[in-house]
Amino acid sequence: MSKKPSAGGKIQWTKMFRKLSPYTIRKGFRYMKHYGPKEFWIRLHERFEPEEVPYGTWYRAYIPTEETLETQRKQKFDYSPLISIAVPAYQTPVEFLRQMIESLIVQTYSNWELCIVNASPDNEEMQKVLAEYSAGDSRVRFCNLKENLGIAENTNRAFAMTKGEFVGLLDHDDLLAPNALYEIVKILQDHPQADALYTDEDKVTTELDEHFQPHLKPDFNLDLLRSNNYICHFFVVRKSIVEKAGGFRKEFDGAQDYDFIFRCTENAGEVLHVPEILYHWRTHKASTADNPASKMYAFEAGKRAIEAHLERTGTKGEVSHTQDLGFYRVKYPVQGKPLVSVIIPNKDEKETLQTCLEMLEKNTGYQNFEIIIVENNSTTDEIFRYYKELSGNRKIHLLRWGKEFNYSAINNFAAAHAKGEYLLFLNNDVKSINPDWLEEMLGVCQRPEVGGVGAKLIYPDNTIQHAGCVIGMGGIAGHMFVDMPADRTGYLHKASLLQDMSAVTAACLLMKKEVFEQTGGFTEELAVAFNDVDLCLKVRKNGYLIVYDPYAKLYHMESKTRGAEDSKEKVRRFQTEIEYMRCHWIDILKKGDPCYNKNLSLTKWNYSLKPIPGMETEAGQKKEKTGRKSCRKYQ
């Protein structure tokens, strides 16, 4: 993959100034004081760079028309479970309370109940509103507590009110999209045994006049969940799982939902993701959506929730905060001292190989490895003299490949000679940044559910070359965050979070040898392109995880010895490999990468929105043509 011109770098000043207020200015100063000027400037760029596809315009084209909603109301499902919505309410502004309730009343799926626990016994306005709605719609029920018992116990009281087969969690000042429950029940038609579901979400201003910051999620992603409560809203779970998990726990107040989601997913069979924006998280001064620092205690509770999850699952790991509030790092310690076989193909490159070997010797903390160099038809005397110099090193083994270049065959050949329990496929043109890179990757790879681990690779100019691969990107597969400054974290900090991916590059790929052999190794029909993607997909098909690890960082020159793919022969070979991937992985190419999202672009590496056909660029035009409303007004 060749480097592309950077798409970012400029701040959208008009947008930034429009957002300014005394409150946002104070918030900015707090951030700069806490993180420093450099980090503040980086985040300012990320927050206010122009959107490739503006979310406001996109959202107006995305939401269902009134005609579509009416069609949904008439839909009769074979399986129509009662869904109970549990809402703990405390000192809720009555306007917010009304809007939340109205967002349920206008649902296109009607078999629901709303169970509200009012923990504000002295708030007469709230009691009047609740009594009014309860009298007008029997599906709206409420209970007045004598005192505020705290968010966890208030929610448990709401759980106790529920009668439905499924229970959904809704904050007292947030909103559901009118098709939220419809989409939940729709996916249950094909997955009636599912135990838990979650949807995508966005944020909405206090006055409901602007939607922003869409959170477009992957399918269930264990390592991402251990890095951040990405599931968050809207979470719906079978009531039997709620009872088994035990409800909310007050010792995790501030991150009680995070702890609850962990326990539910641990007990659940199938966890489904509904890739639609069905929850609107209202921002205001007191909410963590707008001001994370307003609930600093919540982030410590989140750390403890991860630690408790690791303990329950018997997983050894050390949890720490990252520089971004609410995002965490789990460091998995290496168990024992397993042998790692480092496989490095090489042709002619003496200086490049020498730099790589010196890195392994001097800038790699974990030293229990053997090095297998696969000599591939070199022609220079210099490289053979260097091989002779290496012959005295007992860690290094030289294999000779006499056939034509075939990356897959070369690595399979080396793997057959490897003595290690783990195989590290490593390009000769990489150089480590942090000495614990191999230890970091090995700790992750030793987990029983993990098949392979890929590193974060950075160009010499400190821009990203690889931060995981997305299937379908650019046609077959492509790297994410290419050419983004390495000190940026990207969309929802994904460039800097440990997470499961469908594929990672084999320029630095650690894999259990047993798993490699189970999958049949690299597919030799893929001589140059997509062989690593194909291998990762085979590993995932066998039930193992492929993990992107941003804490293992290396510099990478990328295909320095191969040159450009520009000859007729290379182009023809590349087309053949594309056809192989299309034939063998047609299902995932059609359905979409489960570690990505259907509403994200397959032509942009930076998690941009996928344009909706026919969407207008001028605000309001689509609304007039289709009857869509960009921000629904709830009475």
Set out the residue ranges of the language-model regions.
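A recurrent flexible, glycine/aromatic-enriched loop bordering the glycosyltransferase active site
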Residues: A152, A160, E210-S240, S408-A409, ...
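Short, acidic, metal-binding catalytic loop of nucleotide-sugar glycosyltransferases
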Residues: E102-N111, D190, E358-N368
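A short, conserved alpha-helix in the catalytic core of glycosyltransferases
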Residues: I241-K244, E251-I277, I306, W437-M441, ...
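Glycine-rich, basic loop-to-helix element that forms the pyrophosphate-binding segment
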Residues: L145-T162, E183, W401-A418
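Short aromatic/hydrophobic "clamp" motif used to bind/position activated sugar donors
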Residues: V167, L423
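A conserved acidic beta->alpha catalytic loop
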Residues: S110, N118-K128, E147, I373-Y386, ...
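Conserved donor NDP-sugar-binding/catalytic core segment of glycosyltransferases
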Residues: N179-F212, V430-I476
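N-proximal low-complexity "stem/linker" segments adjacent to membrane-targeting elements
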Residues: K33-S103, E307-K362
